[in-house]
Amino acid sequence: MDKNMTLEKRIAAELYSYQGKMSVFVDDLHGHTVEIGADEEFETASTIKAYILAALYLQASRGKASLEEKITYKPEHFVDGSGMLRALGVGASLKVKDAATMMIICSDNIATNMVIDYLGLDVINACIREMGFAHTVLHNPLHFDLYADLGTTTPRDYASLFAQVAKGTLVSAEASAEMLAIFRQQHYNTMLTRDFPQFYLDCEETGEPELIWVASKSGSMNACRNDGG
């Protein structure tokens, strides 16, 4: 690839060489963006969980939800796939914040359904719209019979969510900081970091702080792969 090409042209060349459908939105937080198909709608897979987390913090900021309230794993929350709550069994009780944290860091599907049930699907969508993500919708709770219709979003909306978290402007500075800390613990970050030199991310041998840290939320289903951070 020509090293004299602009970043946008280099990214476009990679995207256009791909046989499937791919779009990207990049924001350096200093006024420069790369936008290629940024307003195309895509199935969210588990990336919708980032919006659910934001909706939870918005409701908590208004006193309409409590991060410390206990919620219970009910039979209707069960769904297969990623997560740890399957090992605990129906009847397990945990704080809303703990369920939301599991929803992000290990993409726990049961925890996600618990949070959706706690907030309400319509409330979540109202919060998503209010936060300015006009092309993002949570269509259903997680159920593999409906997984292809879980939610839709755009690269622009998803990048905007993380840009606001990074700037401390999503809900509030305190809420953004808490969400950022949760996103930093996300286990499934290999898509974003795939081509990063490992020594940038892992400095355990030297004892030095990592040169790069990642706060993200990925999602995948069938032939769909999404990531953002």
Describe every region a protein language model picked out.
Residues K21, M114-L170:
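Mid-domain, small-residue-enriched loop/turn segments at the edges of structured enzyme/sensor domains
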Residues I36-E43, G89, A100, Y147-A148:
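A short glycine/serine-rich beta->alpha loop
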Residues E43-I71:
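Active-site SXXK
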Residues A50, D149-R184, R225-G229:
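Active-site-proximal alpha-helical segments within enzyme catalytic domains
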Residues R62-L88:
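Short, glycine/proline-biased beta-turn/loop segments that scaffold the active-site neighborhood
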